[in-house]
Amino acid sequence: YMQYGNGRIVSHFFVMLFLTAPKIIFDVLNAFLFVFFIAFVLRITASKKSFSILLFFAVPTLFWLYMPAYGQVFLWLTGCINYMWSYLFALLFLNIYISLLRGKSLLDKKWKLISFCLFTFLFGNYSENVSFSVIFTGFLLMCVTMYQHKTIRKYLSYVFPIICGAAGYLVLLLSPSGSAKFSDNPVSY
């Protein structure tokens, strides 16, 4: 697939998987992930840990009102796997570095770090549009945290997920079909 399609191995794996499965499976999973996405938006942006039912309903309403092509991003199978799911994965990624900036280490065990490195490699390969900017933002948040605490050694383990994410992004970008976009003689099929 990387040779003739594109390098989005992870996202297009899910697209192909759910296109072959009964539609109800995708619909239920996507509804769950949408609720999880809204909850994560609230978690990252909220200054308090209290839950507001008003905000929980206001956020999706605002997405519905102000998101261009709402149906293509949140409802259409291919669109939501490529866009909404990538936004959710971006929030999961950034949550680690935002929590670190707020003084809470979420990668305190080795298995968590290894799992997060695997996740960031897959996330780096997920979407050209989202992956680079989010990984770079995570890097900047890590640098700000190191600067605030005047230490590098304590936060050095947080560099590994950034490297894994960059490696996943490079696999996406340097795939034969992906690199053809940047060549002087693009391949046409």
Residue ranges, per PLM feature:
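Transmembrane catalytic cores of multi-pass membrane glycosyltransferases
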Residues: Y1-I24, V28, L77, W111, ...
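Membrane-interface micro-motifs in multi-pass membrane enzymes
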Residues: R8, L55-I98, S127
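Transmembrane-helix motifs of polytopic, lipid-linked glycan transferases
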Residues: A31-L54, L92
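Transmembrane alpha-helices and membrane-interface helical segments
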Residues: A39-R43, L92-S99, T137-M146
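Membrane-interface helix-boundary motifs at transmembrane edges
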Residues: L42-S52, L101-K109, T145-L156
